[in-house]
């Protein structure tokens, strides 16, 4: 392989390809002599869109094929939505750059209602996320949440043909695909706390590939990296995955990190939440300590119950 080439592994969905082109454009801007070649791939997660993620092994199904391509030296980097990435990496790989984060919030979309609070009892809301389901049931107990899979276009089509009264999607994905006009309402974190890593693009690479590591470092956005490190540290301590409703959202306020998080039951009947602040050097410590607090206040029992199901 030429030293002036990077092979980029990506999923084939429109959003994944947008993210891949974003990274390609950035790398070629900072390194004018570099040529980035996209290697679109179909992952296991793309092949089982009819089944809820919580029942199929989680979002790691969307990254394993890409990781294998990097490990086998068929690709040099893999580009992911960080919220889809597992907490632990295969030996030899790592999350080496976090691009500047897009809006991490959730969006409410409906053809009939202008505000999520207007939903009447019995309204059907679509989402594939247990985190969103938990918070929707907590705040609006009269609604019915049903699973919603597929890429963004497929989900919008299901809304348009009347399968759902409303759906909830990530703001970042809609903005990246030029679909801001479909958003009815952006949900405040107090109503729908985002998932760890939501809205952020991550670059995975072989840790011994020093040349590529130096190149992709130019795309790393330090403030976004700090927030993501904080959010994912909490998830690691909780050992939380797609089968568990967990929100983990860090912001920078007054020159310090502010992490808010919750662990909940899927039906929204029980939610343990909390927050913690600290300096930038303590990003992972903040997440770890808040996780311990949540565990001591009842999250451990929720997680144990979910693991038995």
UniProtKB/Swiss-Prot annotation:
The modification S-(dipyrrolylmethanemethyl)cysteine is found at residue 242. GO terms for cellular component: cytoplasm. Its EC number is 2.5.1.61. Binds 1 dipyrromethane group covalently. It catalyses: 4 porphobilinogen + H2O = hydroxymethylbilane + 4 NH4(+). GO terms for molecular function: hydroxymethylbilane synthase activity. The keyword Metal-binding does not apply. One of its GO terms (biological process) is protoporphyrinogen IX biosynthetic process. Coiled coil: none annotated. Belongs to the HMBS family. Monomer. This is Porphobilinogen deaminase. It comes from Hamiltonella defensa subsp. Acyrthosiphon pisum (strain 5AT). The gene is hemC.
């Amino acid at each position: 392989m030429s030293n002036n080439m990077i092979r980029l592994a990506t999923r084939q969905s429109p959003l994944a390809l947008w993210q891949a082109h974003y990274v390609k454009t950035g790398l070629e801007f900072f390194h004018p002599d570099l040529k980035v070649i996209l290697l679109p791939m179909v992952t296991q997660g793309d092949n089982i869109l009819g089944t809820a993620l919580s029942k199929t092994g989680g979002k790691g199904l969307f990254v394993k094929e890409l990781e294998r391509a990097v490990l086998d030296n068929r690709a040099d980097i893999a580009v992911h939505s960080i919220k889809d990435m597992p907490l632990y990496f295969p030996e030899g790989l790592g999350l080496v750059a976090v691009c500047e984060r897009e809006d991490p919030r959730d969006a409410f979309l409906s053809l009939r209602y202008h505000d999520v609070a207007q939903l009447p009892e019995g309204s059907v809301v679509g989402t594939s996320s247990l985190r969103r389901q938990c918070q929707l049931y907590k705040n609006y107990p009269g609604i019915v949440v049903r699973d919603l899979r597929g890429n963004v276009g497929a989900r919008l089509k299901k809304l348009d043909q009347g399968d759902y009264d409303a759906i909830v999607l990530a703001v970042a994905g809609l903005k990246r695909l030029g679909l801001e006009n479909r958003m009815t309402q952006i949900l405040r974190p107090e109503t729908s706390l985002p998932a760890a890593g939501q809205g952020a693009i991550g670059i995975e690479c072989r840790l011994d590939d020093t040349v590529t590591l130096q190149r992709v470092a130019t795309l790393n956005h330090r403030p976004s990296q700090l927030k993501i490190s904080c959010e994912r540290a909490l998830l690691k301590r909780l050992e939380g995955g797609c089968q568990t409703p967990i929100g983990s959202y860090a912001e920078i306020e007054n020159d310090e990190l502010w992490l808010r998080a919750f662990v909940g039951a899927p039906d929204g009947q029980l939610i343990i939440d909390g927050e913690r602040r600290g300096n930038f050097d303590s990003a992972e410590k903040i997440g770890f300590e808040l996780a311990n607090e949540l565990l001591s206040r009842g999250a451990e029992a929720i997680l144990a119950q979910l693991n038995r199901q």
